[in-house]
UniProtKB/Swiss-Prot annotation:
Function: Regulates PLK1 kinase activity at kinetochores and promotes faithful chromosome segregation in prometaphase by bridging kinase and phosphatase activities. Phosphorylation of FIRRM by PLK1 negatively regulates its interaction with the phosphatase, PPP1CC, thus creating a negative feedback loop for maintaining proper PLK1 kinase activity during mitosis. In complex with FIGL1 may regulate homologous recombination.
Residues modified to N6-acetyllysine: K843
Lineage: Eukaryota, Metazoa, Chordata, Craniata, Vertebrata
GO biological process, one term: chromosome segregation
Complex and partners: Interacts (via its N-terminal region) with PLK1; controls PLK1 kinase activity. Interacts (via the KVVXF motif) with PPP1CC; controls PLK1 kinase activity. Interacts with FIGNL1; may regulate homologous recombination.
Xref: PANTHER family: CHROMOSOME 1 OPEN READING FRAME 112, FIGNL1-INTERACTING REGULATOR OF RECOMBINATION AND MITOSIS
Pfam families in UniProt: DUF4487
Annotated InterPro entries: DUF4487 (IPR027902)
Native organism: Mus musculus (Mouse)
Main location: nucleus
Keyword annotations: Acetylation, Centromere, Chromosome, Cytoplasm, Cytoskeleton, Kinetochore, Nucleus, Phosphoprotein
GO molecular function: protein kinase binding
Protein name: FIGNL1-interacting regulator of recombination and mitosis
Length: 903
């Protein structure tokens, strides 16, 4: 029989079968079903396939034994059906290239294929509906091939619908009606299948194959989720709901076979996508929310979806935590990404009402998630990893995460507290992590970023800065810190104080001061002694020494009187070796009966040190001890000046006058030690200005004029300003007035026009103090020689901002600066400090070259000539011939460089 004859014969048979009654189908089932299945396997026609499938499902399936459906029907029909459906998809993709409104033949072909696909899906829907109707509790073994084959067809249909714009290009409108039907039928089939699978019960003692089938179903639905995520929100959510429900329902049986990492990753991706959509909608809501506002209703719908996903993640994490070790990094990143879009400099601009709604509906669920993960060592490892290179926008979220975790630790068992509070080669402790990441939030600290404060009894919630937020929570944590972990607390605080990041160091100092107040007096005294020894042993001048000295100064104010006496005895002011320490101590910290004797003793020892230097060879190397003595005297004057009698004040003033005679202008510019001595002398002279000899004042002003012209370092200029502002208290006699006043005007003018904004600010402050106090009003207008200077002074006095910058522009600038300065400052090692530039340059033997002195002499002369030219350019217009001459000089320098290189 030919193929055509066979098709005709089968058509006759199918036509005959379609007219059978229900009773006849039941009776003839054993003989007819094998024949139908044979026809189904042999047929090459889609139409015939669909007719046979429809007859089997509608007429014979109701009479089959539900316990043998797998063997008698599904295992024989489904593989061929899948092949048929995949073939239809391939042909659709191929034919779609030729689709056009003019090509009616292709239109008909494509529409017929789509209708055939819908009919295939309808046939499988009938299978699922029948199983659901006949079995209250489904045994998975009796339908084991049905779920996987159906899910394959559903996914293929959804993928085709999702890619339809690409497949059909600009001709989608010709088939869009059938694509909608295809999507709805696949949607309906999946709902029917999920209803069927919901009745499945897995017994741990049954065949392991059943568990694998359920695992395969969950993973297939996971793939479908990724396809439909942007197509239908409700359907997407329902699919996820089923995945989570079945995963937890059969958890005891399938927990070890599930791809937990993939489930968590997909769920986190959907959370982020929904949250991003929610924020975009929130940005569009400019008017107060109203029930009739379509944008607001869509925002609420998306926010509920975010909450649903977060709840799903919360439930899944709770049950499957032991299997989530390789998902902890994903969960960590989820928390950071969400908060980066809500709180950081990169956050979306939404109204306060929307922010509160998002926080109360969605963000609130992240807190119990962290509670669940708190005991997980892999999560701790992920959060506190030493090599965690986070981008700028995730630094603030990292700080907030660590603060949330820290707040929860006091209620946790000691082993959990220890887990978070210890560190090793691969991870930091939580305290170290907070301090480090806090230091990276320069942009948020400078704006500053505000966070929601905690509510007190009867008090409204007040926004607080990031600094306040972290500091308060750190102090609360310290108050509840387990005693066995105190050594780690001390180490973390000290490490942070020694940080080169100013914000980190100040935060650690504030926490340490809280500890000094909260802890025992004995603990406070121990810490003061510890820091004092560190200050004494710290070499050279470095930021770490500055930080330690500030901490020491603050801690002393919390020291009990008996311990203050012990401190004075341990670090006696009578010993010159202790002067290095006392220069950093404010005597205001001591009780009044201790302050005066300490002040007098320090001044006596310092005067002796100054006399010793005056009677020595006065080398640069010996300036170290002199500077220390001067620094101590300045500290005493500023913190306990009233404790000194007139005799001591006079003696100090005399020493200052003698020391001033050794000031050398050239060394001020080139030698750091001389710069420090010069600055200290100026500040001390400013303190004693009422008793300083007028001739000495004239000499000082004359030196200052020369120094300012050479553009000294900023710290020297600041000392100059201290001295200048003090002159406002002084009446300058006629004998030196003509020398002093014009010089003062020149100095102030030079510093006001300085391009350094900090120096300019201090100059304006010094000028204001001088102008308000001086009896020589005629000098004030002389200092305001140009319109630019007048405007700066007026703006300063009126407290007006020099630049009116929009909030958005300010945030953008801060983000840009944060990106530029994101790399943390390099740590200063002890060796670097020992050989720091603050020390005078060490002399060493050198090889004498022929004509070397001549080379040096000529080069110094050339350098001085260039400095003079630079000075002239800053105070006058350049002549026309200067630029060509400089270019010619540049050419000669290049020629000389080539001569040096070639020898």
């Amino acid at each position: 029989m030919s193929q055509d004859d066979a098709e005709v014969a089968s058509g006759v048979v199918l036509e005959e079968l379609s007219s059978w009654s229900e009773e006849m189908c039941r009776r003839e089932l054993p003989s007819v079903l094998p024949r139908l299945l044979s026809m189904y396997q042999c047929s090459e026609s889609w139409i015939e396939h669909i007719r046979i499938l429809k007859i089997i499902v509608e007429m014979f399936l109701p009479h089959m034994n539900h316990l043998t459906l797998e063997e008698t029907l599904f295992s024989q029909v489904l593989p061929k059906s899948i092949k048929l459906f995949d073939g239809m998809i391939c042909e659709l993709t191929s034919e779609a290239r030729e689709l056009s409104s003019q090509n009616l033949e292709i239109q008909v072909t494509i529409r017929n294929i789509l209708q055939a696909m819908v009919q295939v899906i309808g046939g499988f829907t009938g299978c699922v509906r029948h199983v659901c109707a006949t079995q209250k509790s489904v045994f998975l073994g009796s339908i084991q091939s049905l779920p996987s084959f159906i899910l394959h067809i559903i996914k293929s249909a959804f993928v085709h619908c999702k890619n339809s714009e690409c497949v059909y290009s600009g001709r989608l409108h010709l088939v869009s009606d059938l694509l909608q039907v295809l999507f709805k039928e696949a949607y309906s089939l999946q709902k029917q299948l999920m209803g069927l699978l919901d009745t499945v019960c897995l017994d741990p003692s049954v065949d392991e194959n059943n568990a694998l089938i359920m695992v395969g179903v969950i993973h297939s639905l996971l793939d479908i989720c990724s396809v439909i995520s942007g197509m239908d929100q409700a359907f997407h959510a329902n699919t996820w709901k089923f995945i989570i429900k079945q995963s937890l329902k059969h958890h005891s049986v399938i927990k070890s076979q599930l791809r937990h990492k993939e489930i968590i990753s997909s769920l986190c991706e959907d959370i982020l996508f929904s949250f991003h959509s929610c924020l975009q909608l929130a940005e569009q809501i400019t008017q107060p929310a109203a029930q009739g506002n379509a944008d607001y209703r869509l925002f609420q719908k998306t926010l509920k979806l975010c909450r649903f996903f977060a709840n799903s993640l919360l439930h899944y994490t709770k049950e499957c935590l032991p299997f989530l070790s390789d998902s902890c990094c994903t969960l960590h990143q989820l928390y950071l990404q969400i908060h980066s879009k809500f709180l950081s400099l990169c956050a979306a601009k939404t109204s306060k009402a929307q922010q509160e709604e998002i926080a109360s509906t969605f963000l609130v669920l992240l807190d119990p998630l962290i509670s669940q993960l708190l005991k997980s060592q892999p999560f701790v490892q992920a959060v506190l990893a030493s090599k965690l290179a986070l981008p700028c926008e995730l630094q603030l979220p990292q700080v907030l995460l660590l603060v949330v975790a820290m707040d929860k630790l006091p209620s946790q068992p000691q082993d959990v507290q220890t887990l978070w509070s210890t560190e090793d080669m691969t991870r930091m402790s939580i305290l170290k992590g907070i301090f480090y990441n806090f230091g990276q939030c320069s942009g948020e600290l400078s704006l500053p970023t505000h966070l929601q404060g905690t509510k007190g009894k009867g008090q409204a919630e007040v926004p607080v800065t990031l600094y306040q937020h972290v500091c308060v929570h750190l102090c609360a944590f310290v108050a509840s810190f387990h005693s066995s972990l105190f050594p780690r607390l001390d180490a973390a605080l000290l490490n942070a104080v020694l940080s080169t990041n100013m914000s980190t160091s100040l935060l650690a100092m504030d926490v340490w001061c809280f500890l000094a107040r909260y802890g025992t007096a004995k603990l406070g005294a121990h810490h003061v002694t510890l820091v004092a020894h560190l200050v004494k042993s710290c070499p050279g001048k470095c930021v770490q020494l500055t930080n330690l000295s500030i901490l020491l100064k603050r801690l002393l104010f919390f020291m009990a009187a008996p311990h203050q006496v012990q401190f004075i005895q341990k670090f006696s002011p009578k010993e010159a070796d202790n002067l290095h320490l006392w220069q950093y101590i404010s005597l205001q910290a001591f009780d009044a009966d201790l302050r005066k004797p300490v002040a007098c003793e320090l001044v006596r020892v310092c005067r002796a040190q100054c006399r010793k230097w005056l009677s020595s060879t006065r080398t640069l190397a010996e300036l170290d001890s002199l500077n220390t003595a001067l620094s101590v005297v300045l500290t005493v004057c500023n913190s306990a000046g009233e404790a000194l009698d007139s005799r001591q004040l006079t003696a100090v003033t005399e020493v200052l006058g003698e020391l001033w005679t050794f000031i050398n202008v050239e060394q001020i510019i080139s030698q750091p030690y001389v710069q420090q001595a010069f600055s200290l002398l100026l500040q001390l002279l400013a303190f004693f200005i009422q008793t300083v000899d007028l001739q000495l004042i004239s000499q000082v002003v004359n030196v200052l004029t020369s120094v300012i012209k050479l553009e000294p370092p900023d710290h020297v200029s600041l000392a100059v300003l201290d001295f200048i502002s003090s002159l406002g208290k002084l009446y300058i006699s006629q004998t030196i007035r003509d020398k002093v006043l014009p010089s003062l005007s020149c100095i102030l003018t030079s510093l006001i026009v300085n391009k350094n904004w900090l120096l300019e600010q201090h100059t304006l402050e010094a000028f204001t103090q001088f102008a308000e106090g001086t009896k020589h009003e005629e000098i004030v207008p002389q200092c305001l020689g140009s319109e630019e200077i007048k405007n700066k002074v007026v703006s300063f006095l009126e407290k007006t901002e020099s630049v009116d910058e929009a909030e958005v522009a300010t945030v953008d600038n801060v983000k840009q600066e944060k990106g530029t300065f994101w790399e943390p400052a390099a740590k200063v090692t002890v060796e670097e400090v020992k050989t720091s530039a603050f020390q005078p340059h060490t002399k060493r033997a050198r090889r004498v070259l022929p004509f070397e002195e001549e080379y040096r002499s000529v080069f110094k002369a050339a350098a001085r000539a260039l400095e003079t030219t630079e000075f002239l350019l800053k105070h006058s217009l350049a002549p026309a011939w200067l630029l060509p001459e400089l270019e010619a000089l540049q050419g000669r320098i290049e020629k000389l460089k080539r001569c040096v290189l070639t020898g």
